[in-house]
Amino acid sequence: ISMKGGVPSHDTFRRIFCILDFENFQKIFIAWTQDIKKSLKIKNDQICIDGKTLCGSLNKLKSMKAVHMVNAWSTGMSMSLGQIPTEEKSNEITAIPLLLDLLDLKNCLVSIDAIGCQTEIANKVTVKGGNYLLAVKENQKGLYEEELRQTEIMRLN
């Protein structure tokens, strides 16, 4: 592509991103990723949901907390399908269902770490036609003990 005025600067991109409506951009971006998925004929994708604190986003001088995002990553397309900002890591539980609402999960395996091991999240994935792989930790005592029991039964058989 020929750019008569030269390549846009970092500042130009920053100004554009600052005026974009985040929610509308996100909807358009997710629709675009779904079109790519269809054109690549990816039918059984794995979607990895994970929260990350953005490096360098903490600003102590301005009393600004670090930015935390919950991201959905497609292993089949090797790209992010969408993300939701959260106030803190503890808010991932409320952000994950919002992110799942935006995604097409039909025939997908959705993997989430232990913070996503919630009945509401598992139900949402299955209602949307997907399957889930959730990590279980000891802080969910009943579920953890049942998992150990089932694992022992499978090992003995």
Q: Language-model segments: which ranges?
A:
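Active-site- or DNA-interface-adjacent structural scaffold in DNA-acting proteins
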Residues: 3-62, 129
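Generic hydrophobic, helix-prone segments enriched in Leu/Val/Ile
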Residues: 4, 70, 147-151
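Flexible, active-site-adjacent loop/turn segments at secondary-structure boundaries
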Residues: 5, 52, 79, 134, ...
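Surface-exposed loop/turn and secondary-structure junction residues enriched for glycine/proline
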Residues: 6, 10, 23, 57, ...
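Preference for short coil/turn "hinge" residues that link or interrupt alpha-helices
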Residues: 13, 74-77, 129, 136
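Active-site-proximal flexible loops/turns
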Residues: 16, 57, 81, 120-121
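RNase H-like nuclease fold core
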Residues: 35-106
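An internal, acidic/charged active-site-proximal segment
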Residues: 86-157
